[in-house]
Design a protein with these regions (language model features):
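Bacterial Sec-dependent N-terminal signal peptides
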Residues: 1-22
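C-terminal hydrophobic helical "lid"/dimerization subdomain
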Residues: 22-26, 325-378
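Glycine-rich beta-strand-centered segment in the early N-terminal region that forms part
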Residues: 48-62, 75-125, 130, 153, ...
Length: 378
């Protein structure tokens, strides 16, 4: 009897301690795929409890990125299921850990493509957490090694628990329904444009005029560049002009490609399908630069012959992957201050609609970004 009483007291103390620390997890519901067929179904799971340096975000909006489609369909290799995609997240803070200073309850907050890193390697020390030498922890389809190897699940859900250092402050005056895509598509295009140092009058090209490309055009026009858009359809010609592009080239029309070699200081390729990068290399001026941020499926990955690099007037080709947290915050503040937002189509949070939206992304039948209203989640 005495032993049972002691055990009962110990259990009560442990339970009280666990409650005080917030142990027990955060019940979460959302939409997941359970295999690579792209069919979304309701899914309930538990996120880890809010830690001392973490916040809990009520998700208001989640963008659909083309890379979500690639992951869901295993275009880049085997994945683990069930999978809740979504790394373009905008919401409101509903809980803060006791050490949090960056946010308070009620603030808008966002999450992009990553939610953790080692924070001490050379890349992390230079605010390039996406290149963490121990591996950045992705917002979904990953393992959170700092929270009990919990599988990360993304933003097609009603909440997210994240370290305050990996959450982005969303200005109170932001058009919140349009913010989410900026946290992937926005930073993916902003970062190489910023790092190249585009200036007024530079002649630049944007290859691919979709979710990424239409944001790139807005950033470049704001900087005073002379922008040409390259795409495979006539359907977006008027949109490119409306956003400030001075020229639109349908690459399926050979006549429109004439006279473009050695014309551009910088070209940004956002193309997520198979194409010929050498065509764009040849369009660069002496010392011109081609930045590649679009990634096709593994079976459609383009190749660049070495001679196309060596023999072409000191032209440079480089890749760029999203941006660090500091640069992402800079991008968001700049975008909101300058009225740069994606053009979005808001859809309800139901499995059938999300599944249909994915197919439309594959078919190129979206202008320019689908955003899920997670407030409609039932």
């Amino acid at each position: 009897m005495k032993r049972n009483i002691i055990l009962a007291i110990m259990c009560t103390v442990c339970t009280m301690a666990a409650s005080a620390q917030g142990v027990g997890g955060v019940p979460t519901k959302g939409f997941a795929v359970f295999k690579n067929d792209g069919q979304f179904k309701p899914y309930a799971f538990t996120r880890h409890a809010v830690g001392d340096n973490e916040i809990q975000i009520e998700i208001l909006y989640a963008g659909i990125c083309h890379s979500d489609v690639h992951h869901v369909r295993e275009d880049w290799g085997p994945e683990k299921y069930p999978m809740v995609p979504g790394h373009e997240i905008a919401g409101r803070v509903v809980k803060v850990g006791r050490n949090v200073t960056k946010f308070k309850v009620g603030d808008y907050a966002g999450i992009g493509c990553m939610i953790g890193s080692c924070r001490h390697c050379e890349a992390c020390e230079h605010d390039l957490e996406q290149y963490c030498e121990e591996g950045a922890i992705m917002t979904y389809h990953d393992i959170d090694r700092y929270n009990g190897n919990e599988p990360t699940q993304g933003g097609y859900s009603d909440n997210y628990v994240v370290a305050e250092d990996f959450a982005i402050k969303i200005p109170a005056n932001a058009e919140i329904e349009k913010v989410a895509p900026l946290l992937c598509a926005g930073i993916t295009t902003y970062s190489p444009i910023r790092n190249v140092g585009i200036k007024k009058g530079d002649k630049v090209g944007v290859a691919g005029f979709g979710g990424l490309g239409h944001l790139a055009v807005q950033y470049l026009v704001k900087l005073g560049a002379d922008v040409t858009v390259f795409d495979v359809t006539e359907a977006k010609r008027a949109d490119a002009a409306r956003m400030g592009a001075t020229r639109y080239v349908n690459v399926n029309n050979s006549d429109e490609l004439q006279g473009l070699n050695k014309q551009y200081d910088f070209i940004l390729s956002t193309i997520p399908a198979k194409y010929d990068p050498v065509m764009y290399v040849k369009m660069l001026k002496l010392d011109g630069q081609l930045a590649i941020v679009g990634i096709p499926s593994a079976t459609n990955m383009p190749s660049i012959p070495v001679n196309a690099i060596v023999m072409n007037s000191n032209r440079k080709i480089f890749g760029s992957q999203i941006g660090g947290i500091k640069e992402t915050q800079e991008m968001l503040d700049y975008s909101v201050a300058n009225g740069i937002y994606p053009e979005v189509e808001i859809i309800p949070a139901d499995g059938k609609t999300i599944t249909e939206a994915y197919q439309k992304v594959v078919d190129g039948d979206v202008k320019f970004r689908y955003v899920i209203d997670m407030q409609t989640l039932k």
